[in-house]
Design a protein with these regions (language model features):
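Preference for the N-terminal adenyl/adenosyl cofactor-binding alpha/beta module
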Residues: 2-212
């Protein structure tokens, strides 16, 4: 297969994935907003301490207030679109850095060394040392076998850590953390599809563009 034809196939695959991922992220981000009683065309009470029986942490209360203010300023749809776009861009950036061994911690975020969707970061969670995520928190999540929540916290902490290296791309998350999509370890998640749908070589700066 010629490199030109392969590139054309890659572009089509990437485009199809991007369209699907955008819609999927918008749906999941919207669902998270609803969980925190932030909905379109409905005035939200920004002083709630308990939602659906769940007591909000101090960080959650601050983030929720920030989210409500953003919705008041920009509109619900615009905020949801921006958050979905933010997470999409960060997943793509992290995957690019993972494939090219650019990650500062030298630990793969989405895959193992065989490019299987078995995130190395889960195995190295106790050793990676990410600001904002204590070993006690990690240990408790490991003990409760809550891998989905552990992975979520590791990804959020990684994005915040990357702000020390690429502050323009990885700004502090703020209220976007509330709207982080759930269940990213599922085989049909945006992250899983990123690995399965788009060839690793598409992100490899050394291999991409080589003539076959």
């Amino acid at each position: 297969m010629s490199s030109m034809r392969k590139k054309g196939m890659n572009k089509t695959t990437i485009k199809n994935y991007a369209i699907w991922a955008r819609n999927e992220l918008i749906e999941r981000v919207t669902r998270k907003a609803f969980e925190y009683e932030v909905k379109k065309d409905i005035k939200s009470d920004d002083n709630m301490d308990v939602i659906n029986g769940k007591v909000l942490t101090e960080d959650e209360r601050k983030q929720r207030k920030g989210l409500i203010k953003a919705v008041d300023d920009k509109g619900f749809d615009q905020v949801i679109e921006e958050v979905a776009y933010t997470w999409f861009n960060r997943f793509i950036a992290l995957r690019f850095m993972e494939v090219n061994n650019y990650l500062p911690k030298r630990v793969r975020i989405f895959t193992n060394e065989n490019n299987e969707f078995k995130p190395q970061i889960l195995d190295e969670a106790m050793n990676i040392g990410l600001e904002g995520l204590s070993k006690e928190d990690i240990y408790n999540l490991l003990q409760s076998n809550n891998r989905q929540e552990l992975y979520k916290q590791l990804l959020i902490a990684t994005c915040n850590d990357m702000g020390n290296y690429l502050p323009g791309m990885f700004t502090r998350i703020g209220y976007k953390e509330l709207l982080f999509p759930d269940n990213l370890l599922n085989n049909d998640s945006v992250v899983a599809r990123l690995i399965s749908d788009i060839e690793e070589d598409s992100f490899n700066v050394q291999k991409e563009g080589q003539i076959e």
